[in-house]
């Protein structure tokens, strides 16, 4: 197989998961077969495909297995950059946890949302892939937990633990506030948390908090330094607010028409295609496989 690049020198591809590589449709999370083939061909050609997501590391590993690239992909970026795992060395390139002051902020946010009477859950993610239900504010907390687990997806193997306090030994890397109703989070942040720049909208249901100085963009920069590459070798693909730091890197920046305006403004290409399909199309547009 030979590779011809329309954008000379591209060899590293950093791709968001939910809403980009992965589409949620008919109560299922799916990757288009054409996109799977494009990723496989890309990797076979010698290029590097790295998932950069808010999800935890084991979720990315499962996606790599589904794509058939678990032996080829050199890194994974998880928890919005709080975890960067070097798959070749089997070690962390980066791991950062929430601080005691972050714990205070988490409790403050929960108290505010309780007063506003939103139906939501505060879920915490640990460095060891553990997921904790910290606070559920809903008429039926058990039904809410089941709804959240269903939303996480069929490729996720979570063992949820309930906790009633925050401890440093949990090694927490991320907090997520998940709302039962969609599109509440943007107004909540705008009206009540305008001074909290680290609160990032990550889906139609959620916003998140990660450790200070953590982002997908920072994670990409760490990889750039380790493997000694430049932006001219990089394509980034994303669809949401937590992808904005990622779009500070790369020479080709790809999203679709459903992305927020500030992401589309940074993009070099905006596709009128749904999630997953636009990733496959972008890879095929920039590479021709013979």
From Swiss-Prot:
Molecular function as annotated in GO: magnesium ion binding; phosphatase activity
E.C. code: 3.1.3.-
Gene3D superfamilies for the chain: 3.30.1240.10, HAD superfamily/HAD-like
GO cellular component: cytosol
Cofactors required: Mg(2+)
InterPro entries: Cof, HAD-like_sf, HAD-SF_hydro_IIB, HAD_sf
Cell membrane listed as a keyword: no
UniProt keyword annotation of Protein biosynthesis present: no
Active site (record annotation): 16 (nucleophile)
A Pfam family of this chain: Hydrolase_3
Key words, A-Z: Hydrolase, Magnesium, Metal-binding
Family note: Belongs to the HAD-like hydrolase superfamily. Cof family.
NCBIfam families listed in its UniProt record: Cof-subfamily, HAD-SF-IIB
Protein known as: Putative phosphatase MPN_427
Organism listed in the record: Mycoplasma pneumoniae (strain ATCC 29342 / M129 / Subtype 1)
